[in-house]
Amino acid sequence: MTDPRETVPPGNSGEETIEEAFAWLDRTVEAINREAVNHHPRELIFQVWQRSWRYWHDEQGMSTSYTKYRYLCLIQMAMYMHAKRDGTCLGGGMGQKGGDQGPPPPPPPGLV
């Protein structure tokens, strides 16, 4: 059986470069977006991204990477609360892939 715990993200071992840390952030945001559409409406995901961008990037003047990080924190919390409350997935029960049968959504604007 594989270890279900998350691996240590870049930046914590002291051996990764900043480029590797940014690549990890990009991969993680894309992966959570792909999973989130199985549990939350696409429109909600895009609204969270757009509001995060407006607040953190436009109003607060933070970097794109920091904005992605704050967005990731919000989406992770939404996924956690969904699972904790035994939320039903858009495609049926927890763990089932379904709901949106099309290709995964494009990343939110600015993540390309």
Curated annotation (Swiss-Prot):
This is Protein Vpx. Coiled coil: none annotated. Residues 90-112 are annotated as: Disordered. Pfam families: VPR. Plays a role in nuclear translocation of the viral pre-integration complex (PIC), thus is required for the virus to infect non-dividing cells. Targets specific host proteins for degradation by the 26S proteasome. Acts by associating with the cellular CUL4A-DDB1 E3 ligase complex through direct interaction with host VPRPB/DCAF-1. This change in the E3 ligase substrate specificity results in the degradation of host SAMHD1. In turn, SAMHD1 depletion allows viral replication in host myeloid cells by preventing SAMHD1-mediated hydrolysis of intracellular dNTPs necessary for reverse transcription. One of its GO terms (cellular component) is host cell nucleus. It comes from Human immunodeficiency virus type 2 subtype A (isolate NIH-Z). Interacts with the P6 region of unprocessed GAG. Interacts with host VPRBP/DCAF1, leading to change substrate specificity of the CUL4A-DDB1 E3 ligase complex. Interacts with host NUP153. Keywords: AIDS, Host nucleus, Host-virus interaction, Inhibition of host innate immune response by virus, Viral immunoevasion, Virion. Residues 102-112 have a biased composition (Pro residues). Residues 90-101 have a biased composition (Gly residues). Residues 61-80 are annotated as: Binds to human NUP153. It is found in: Virion; Host nucleus. Belongs to the lentivirus VPX protein family. A motif (Nuclear localization signal) lies at residues 65-72. The keyword DNA repair does not apply. GO terms for biological process: symbiont-mediated suppression of host innate immune response; viral life cycle.
